UniProtKB/Swiss-Prot annotation:
The active site is at D75, E141. Pfam families: M20_dimer, Peptidase_M20. The lineage of its organism: Bacteria, Pseudomonadati, Pseudomonadota, Gammaproteobacteria, Pseudomonadales. Homodimer. Zn(2+) 1 binds at H73, D107, E170. This is Succinyl-diaminopimelate desuccinylase. It comes from Pseudomonas fluorescens (strain ATCC BAA-477 / NRRL B-23932 / Pf-5). GO terms for biological process: diaminopimelate biosynthetic process; L-arginine biosynthetic process; lysine biosynthetic process via diaminopimelate. Binds 2 Zn(2+) or Co(2+) ions per subunit.
Length: 383
């Protein structure tokens, strides 16, 4: 392991954060450490504890001019079996291959450290920078995400806080740091469908209504439906059934109902209302006695080429020499909440190959590269 004294400022901070076991929604004083550093750098701090979730908003600069916000989360997913790890998941070790190992190394304490060190350096080098540098940090991203970024954004919107650009530190890279940035995400619409039948004896089907038999053609049609064609930025909308439950456990009983859980990952070519109406039409066409509970996790958002994406892409090219690819693939992130403010949102972070896995790790030197990319982006937008 590399001695602590030999580590760069970014790696020192990343290790300090990883050593705090902040399994969602626990923050474990990660934000206290970050706020102390930002306060020392002249940032105005605003802690926002909402229910059992720690959040904070911090800003540095003028009230006039554009605002560049760094957003991220201090919470991490559970470790899984600790004995399966090569080292304690909260030890923050750098191995002989130069990999920083620990829960949160990639998702996303490495990014948090890079953001903070880049911002410290920027406000020192450019104390009279235009606009504002801001941070929006939560401990509720890996969990329900009700009282984290979503709730903070609602407060910021209520007081008409300006947010022009936002870099979310999610691990966007696939093979090399900066090779991919996310300039949007698909929407996520979940549903729990109940199809009601009539329970009975399997030997007397004329006295029962089998919800499995009734629902099967409708579910097959939903699975085969072509929802949209996507567009230049998004693939076509997808429909997936994740759970299907029916039956009493007995082999001689026709069940009384069937429950199917499904999810849409939808592009900007579809709307929530449109998808719901089309599902209802298919279920009605098959004459089902049905009920659906809908749950919208987030609407799709897209940041088209413009000031933020241009600055991030140019900084990646300047620091690494490579051209980045803008993508909307993958799951949802807190960017979906920030985008509701009309903010240009880009996700940029380290390689995501081991996120949420046992032995999560990231190339330690990548975090210093990421710091420089963030710093150069700050210069391009606010210097």
């Amino acid at each position: 392991m590399t001695a602590h004294a030999e580590l760069s400022p970014t790696l020192q901070l990343a290790c300090d954060l990883i050593r705090r076991p902040s399994v969602t929604p626990i923050d474990a004083d990660c934000q206290k450490l970050m706020m102390q550093r930002l306060g020392d750098a002249g940032f105005k701090l605003e802690p926002m504890r909402i229910e059992d979730v720690d959040n904070f908003w911090a800003s540095h600069g003028q009230h006039e001019g554009p605002v560049l916000c760094f957003a991220g989360h201090t919470d991490v997913v559970p470790t899984g079996p600790v004995q399966a790890w090569q080292n304690d998941p909260f030890d923050a070790l750098i191995d002989e291959h130069g990999m920083l190992c620990g829960r949160g190394a990639a998702d996303m304490k490495g990014s948090l450290a890079a953001m903070l060190v880049a911002a410290e350096r920027f406000v020192t080098d450019y104390p009279d920078h235009k606009g504002s540098v801001a941070f929006l940090i939560t401990s509720d991203e890996e969990g329900p995400a009700h009282h984290g970024t979503k709730a903070v954004v609602e407060r910021l919107a209520a007081r008409k806080e300006r947010l022009d650009w936002c870099i979310v530190g999610e691990p966007s890279s696939t093979s090399l740091v900066g090779d991919v940035v996310k300039n949007g995400r698909r929407g996520s619409l979940g549903a729990k469908l109940t199809v009601r039948g009539v329970q009975g004896h399997v030997a007397y089907p004329h006295l029962a209504k089998n919800p499995i038999h009734l629902a099967a053609p409708a579910l097959a049609e939903l699975a085969a439906e072509h929802w949209d064609d996507g567009n230049a930025f998004f693939p076509p909308t997808s429909f997936q059934i994740s759970n299907l439950n029916s039956g009493t456990g007995a082999t001689n009983v026709i069940p009384g109902d069937l429950v199917a859980v499904f999810n849409f990952r939808f592009s900007t070519e579809s709307t929530v209302e449109g998808l719901q109406q089309r599902v209802a039409a298919i279920l009605d066409k098959h004459g089902l006695d049905w009920h659906v509970e809908w749950a919208l996790s987030g609407l799709p958002f897209l940041t088209e080429p413009g000031a933020l994406l241009d600055a991030v892409s140019a900084s990646i090219k300047q620091v690494t020499g490579r051209d980045t690819k803008a993508s909307t693939s993958g799951g949802t992130s807190d960017g979906r909440f920030i985008a509701t403010l009309g903010t240009q949102v880009v996700e940029l972070g380290p390689v995501n190959a081991t996120i949420h896995q046992v032995n999560e790790r990231v190339l330690a030197s990548d975090l210093d590269v990421l710091t420089e990319i963030y710093y150069q982006t700050l210069i391009k937008l606010l210097a």
